């Protein structure tokens, strides 16, 4: 910790030791920005004021939860679009409900494992790389302090338009707090974030796997119910209609959530995601139907 007692955990330092990310409500700040509501923005930047105005006395923990929300939303979108397209292609090829289920469930499990493992590998590699760069920067700050300070002076003057005197003063002050200086340098020089309370690679992989499985299972739910009611040889048309309704509705909800999460227009994001799923399903159905016609014609000719 810095000698002054001011804390740093990935946000901007404030006088009482909290970080900026902990003394404001980021979700409320984003909502206020969407509405261009100045008073709501001011309230969101003061957690105490926000609680006084709303009566909400719960602690605000945004860093880790945001990572989980991201994994759930994007993993869910991948899962439902992928499996819905597979289901549509199978129905277009005139497969029975049981055949659609076999193909769909097999792909669901395989794709979920692939997505979860890919997220784990990607997160682990990113974490290792950032840690290695942090250790290098710490070594350089310890052994080549003047060179590191000069780099930051150049960044302030060239990137942000500081005068050389102000840049030098800024560097001299921040260099007293080595942990802050290293983290700040990693952001400005390397574009790397370090010091946030992020989920472990294993947790990120498991969340991605679970989200893909859960949302990917929704297009198959109608087929599971249809087979349970009418047997393995049941026609797939009505089950596919149910899958279409469930999938498009879920895509709309996930798209809306994605828009809220990334600060886009939620309704526009919802419509785009629903359109994406609809287009993927339509193309897959068309290809399946075409292949069924070609294969059927060849079998008849034979």
UniProtKB/Swiss-Prot annotation:
The consequence of inactivating this gene is: Mild growth defects in cultured parasites under normal conditions and more prominent defects in replication in an iron-depleted environment. Lower number of parasites per parasitophorous vacuole. Accumulation of less iron and/or altered distribution of iron within parasite cells. Parasites are more susceptible to iron and cadmium overload. Parasites have lower cellular iron levels and increased catalase activity. Iron overload leads to reactive oxygen species (ROS) accumulation. Decreased survival of parasites within macrophages and decreased virulence in a mouse model.
Compartments it resides in: Vacuole membrane
Which BP terms does GO give this entry? intracellular manganese ion homeostasis; iron ion transport
Q: Which residues bind Fe cation 3?
A: 140, 148, 151
Binding-site list for Fe cation 1: 137, 140, 148, 151, 189
Its topology with respect to the membrane? Multi-pass membrane protein
State the reactions this protein catalyses. Fe(2+)(in) = Fe(2+)(out)
- Its domain of life reads Eukaryota
Upregulating conditions = Down-regulated upon treatment with excess iron or iron depletion (at protein level). Transcript levels are down-regulated by excess iron and do not change in case of iron removal.
**What's the short name of a Pfam family annotated to this entry?**
VIT1
Q: What range does the record give for the signal peptide?
A: none
Q: Name one GO cellular component term.
A: vacuolar membrane
What spans does the record annotate as topological domain Vacuolar, numbered to this chain? 92-99, 233-235, 298-302
Q: Which InterPro entries match?
A: Ccc1_fam
Residues passing through the membrane, by range: 71-91, 100-120, 212-232, 236-256, 277-297
- Cytoplasmic topological domain residue ranges: 1-70, 121-211, 257-276
Question: What keywords were assigned to this record?
Answer: Ion transport, Iron, Iron transport, Membrane, Metal-binding, Transmembrane, Transmembrane helix, Transport, Vacuole
GO terms for MF: manganese ion transmembrane transporter activity; metal ion binding
* Residues holding Fe cation 2: 137, 148, 151, 185
- Asked if the keyword Iron belongs to this entry, the reply reads yes
Q: Which family, according to UniProt?
A: Belongs to the CCC1 family.
Q: What does this protein do?
A: Vacuolar iron transporter involved in the transfer of iron ions from the cytosol to the vacuole for intracellular iron storage. Plays an essential role in detoxification of excess iron. Important for parasite survival within macrophages and parasite virulence in vivo.
| Protein name per its UniProtKB record | Vacuolar iron transporter
Q: Which organism is it from?
A: Toxoplasma gondii (strain ATCC 50861 / VEG)
């Amino acid at each position: 910790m810095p000698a002054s007692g001011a804390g740093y955990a990935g946000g901007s330092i404030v006088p009482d030791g909290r970080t900026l990310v902990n003394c404001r409500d980021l979700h409320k700040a984003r909502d206020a920005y969407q509405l261009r509501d100045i008073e709501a923005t001011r309230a969101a930047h003061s957690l105490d004021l926000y609680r006084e105005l709303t009566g909400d006395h719960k602690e605000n923990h945004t860093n880790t939860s945001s990572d989980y929300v991201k994994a759930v939303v994007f993993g869910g979108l991948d899962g439902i679009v992928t499996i819905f397209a597979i289901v549509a292609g199978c129905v277009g090829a005139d497969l029975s409900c049981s055949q659609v289920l076999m193909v769909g469930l097999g792909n669901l499990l395989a794709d979920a494992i692939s997505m979860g493992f890919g997220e784990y590998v990607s997160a682990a590699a990113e974490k290792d790389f950032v840690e290695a760069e942090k250790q290098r920067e710490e070594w350089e700050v310890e052994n080549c302090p003047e060179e590191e300070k000069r780099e930051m002076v150049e960044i302030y003057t060239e990137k942000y338009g500081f005068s050389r005197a102000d840049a030098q003063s800024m560097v001299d002050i921040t260099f007293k707090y080595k942990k802050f200086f290293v983290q700040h340098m990693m952001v400005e020089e390397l574009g790397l974030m370090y010091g946030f309370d992020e989920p472990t690679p294993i947790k990120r992989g498991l969340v991605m796997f679970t989200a893909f499985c859960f949302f990917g299972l929704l297009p198959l739910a109608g087929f599971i119910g249809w087979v349970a009611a009418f047997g393995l040889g049941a026609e797939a048309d009505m089950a596919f209609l149910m899958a279409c309704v469930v999938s498009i509705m879920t895509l709309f909800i996930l798209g809306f959530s994605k828009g809220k999460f990334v600060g886009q227009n939620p309704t526009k994001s919802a419509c785009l995601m629903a359109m994406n799923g609809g287009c993927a399903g339509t193309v897959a159905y068309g290809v399946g139907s075409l292949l069924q016609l070609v294969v059927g014609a060849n079998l008849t000719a034979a």
